[in-house]
Amino acid sequence: MTSRPGSGMARVGRQGMGGCPLRQDHHHVEGSPMNALVSAPISNNVVRFEPGIYFGVPEAEYHADQSLGSTSLKELIIDPVEYQHDQLYPGVEKETMALKWGHAIHCRALEGRLSLAERFAIAPAVTDYKDALVTMEHLRSHCKLVGVKPGKKKEEAIAAIREFDKDVLIWDEIIAKFEAENVGRTIIPRDALHEIEMAARWMQRDPKLAPVMRDGTFVAGASEVSIFYVENGVRLKARIDHLLSHAIIDLKSFRPFFKERALEAAKKAVSRMRYDLQAGAYIKALRAAAKLYAEGRVFNNPYDREFLDSVFRALAVAETDADSDDALKWVWVMIKASGAPQPVVGEFDLSSMIFKQAVADVDGAIVAYRGLMEKYGPDNEWEPDIPAQKWGDTDWSPYAFI
């Protein structure tokens, strides 16, 4: 990926081509799983975007549209039975520190320092409150000091202390006050913020990224571009992390399982997490977007027309001459999320065999999805069809049972 003049269009401060997004807000049938078929009945509180290229769509609205995104397509490729099981019996997704870290680096690199400060709050550290009462033992000791009974629970001890001592710092109250003041924000520890700022700084030092970044944030091109389209009667969507006139930037965080070089760990993460399939889904979406662009289906575009003109010119070149400097490239920016937050930047030609196979797999998943929906419907289990196997020595490596 090389920088070139005009790789990032200046914002023009006006409603772009197409005006406001065209969408229908309806209501979803309670308890019904996702159904991305165009023919699916619409009822109750469903957000459905019309086919088009959209700028500035809030993340929550994008995810509310039930079109199949890259994650769903990847799940359908790997195991459609498992996909439908997750739709019918969804578990409660916990927001782990790994997820928070990934969301935070996305926010910092794609939206900027101010957005990170607005959406994320830094948790107070107990080391900043050296005189605070933290444990039950601390509370009991202070109760003894002021001459009150602590009770059996923390809440009882705190209430007893507050009857006689209004000034002593109590850690539980500090945390409760902090959480009440930061409702709606994601809470991360101070160490995580330090790592994220370091990651953003190191990203910008990369010679391929430096020309399109400022203050640790992408400033050329457009972040979080949403594409909605229809294929084979199935509604599909994609949300590109960052789009340059000559490259698709996909930002990922990864955590190595073992101590190894960041470069090798990043490659393993791409393979293990099947990010190739996500890339295949995005490439399909961008090809569909070229047709939507030709039809004028672009909404809330704050950029000069030349920006998307250049994107789709580069895409057309990539289809015929992927090695050309003028061809659109795929760029993974992999950020190590444990230890030193090193960036690994990997550029891929869109014509690579890996991507061609990924696009073919996505094509197959769309066909399979429609067939399974027509056979079983959205509200029923999709029955497994694994034929009985005959296994032998060649089904395992010679070292499998050592």
Question: What positions do the PLM features span?
Answer:
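Conserved catalytic cores of phosphodiester-cleaving nucleases, focusing on short active-site segments
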Residues: 238-265, 282
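Hydrophobic/aromatic-lined pockets within catalytic cores
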Residues: 109-114, 253-256, 287-291
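Metal-dependent nuclease catalytic cores that hydrolyze phosphodiester bonds in DNA/RNA
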Residues: 26-31, 35-238
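Acidic, Ala/Val/Gly-enriched low-complexity intrinsically disordered segments
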Residues: 8-12, 25, 29-30
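Metal-dependent nuclease catalytic regions and adjoining charged, substrate-binding loops involved
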Residues: 35-46, 271-276, 281-402
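Short histidine-centered catalytic/ligand-binding loop motif
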Residues: 91-94, 261-273
